[in-house]
Amino acid sequence: MELDLEPLNFPSDQERPCVIAGPCSAETEEQVMSTAKQLAAKGCHMFRAGVWKPRTKPGGFEGNGETALPWMKQVKEETGMLTATEVATPEHVELALKYGIDILWVGARTSANPFAMQALADSLQGVDVPVLVTNPVNPDLELWIGALQRINQAGIKKLGAIHRGFSSFDKKIYRNLPMWQIPIELHRRIPQLPIICDPSHIGGRRDLIAPLCQQAMDLGFDGLIVESHCSPDDAWSDAKQQVTPEVLDYILSLLVVRDEHYSTEGLHQLRGQIDECDNQLMDLLAKRMRVCREIGTYKKEHNMTIVQTNRYNEILDKRGAQAALCGMSPEFAAQIFEHIHEESVRQQLEILNQK
């Protein structure tokens, strides 16, 4: 998939990661400037703060709006950092550009709405500003790509993606499920698109930010956007997921950034073994499907239903236990066999519907 892109060229002391940091919300001039100066002293080059805050429920702090934009301008003037804020409407775009905001990002609630995305895209026509598009709240890669395409078709070539995880009713560890396979697939389809990880919104807790930052680096993400506040416990929004500039600096100092492209003969040989295993897997799946088609013919001849629930549950239980003995998670095995079963049912239905 092709997008017409130019490098973001974000300032950074190293090739990877670029880091955008700052409070969830621009609360007061004092809070903004204190946080910004502390981050600048730690070597941060890009400052983020929410000016307009789309909250899940009414009644919470929803941002200071235009009142906060002069504070962002002051940050740039006094520290030299680039400034970034979230925009959700054409009016937001107009005001952000009026006050010299350097980087715009689109939030998860906005990217999930094609009407809102098109309105933003129209407002960005003829503008040369970097835009980062956050994944939609629901795990829909096509919706994410569509949002990126709309902005790109408006003429925005300095484009990036933010991965902040996906909403889930069942919240166990993370505030938003990482579902790393989705940004990985986005990178596979659009390899030239920079992807930035938001560990603050994925984790929802300070103690998860460091491991999530490291995992993002291990997966080859280009940068991090992290919520940092001069006094996190007193934050007006998302206090639990913000860290002080000092703590953020410590987290970043511990990161191990691995080479993305370095390869050796030993690695090449191991990948050859993987390829051979994959070939064997495909042969076994083809053999299994041949047997499934024979079963489909038998069911048709004996007027049996395609789905035999007891048999399917038996397979899931047995293969889950087998996976655990082999050092794999039962959930992983269940996902595999759900897909295999889905394809088996599809092929048997074809046989059943043959005249």
Regions found by a protein language model. Give the residues of each.
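Catalytic alpha/beta core domains of metabolic enzymes, predominantly
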Residues: 12, 116-250, 254, 259-265
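Hydrophobic faces of well-ordered beta-strands that scaffold small-molecule active sites
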Residues: 17-23, 45-49, 83-85, 104-106, ...
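Glycine-rich, proline-tolerant flexible connector loops at the mouths of alpha/beta enzymes
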Residues: 48-66, 230-239, 295-306
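N-terminal amphipathic alpha-helix/helix-capping segment at the start of soluble metabolic enzymes
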Residues: 1-20, 74
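Active-site mouth loops of central-metabolism enzymes
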Residues: 17-34, 58-60, 82-87, 107-108, ...
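Catalytic beta/alpha-barrel core
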Residues: 64, 80-89, 93, 102-116, ...
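A structural motif
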Residues: 41-44, 101, 156, 221
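Domain-level signature for soluble enzymes in the chorismate/prephenate branch of the shikimate pathway
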Residues: 260-355
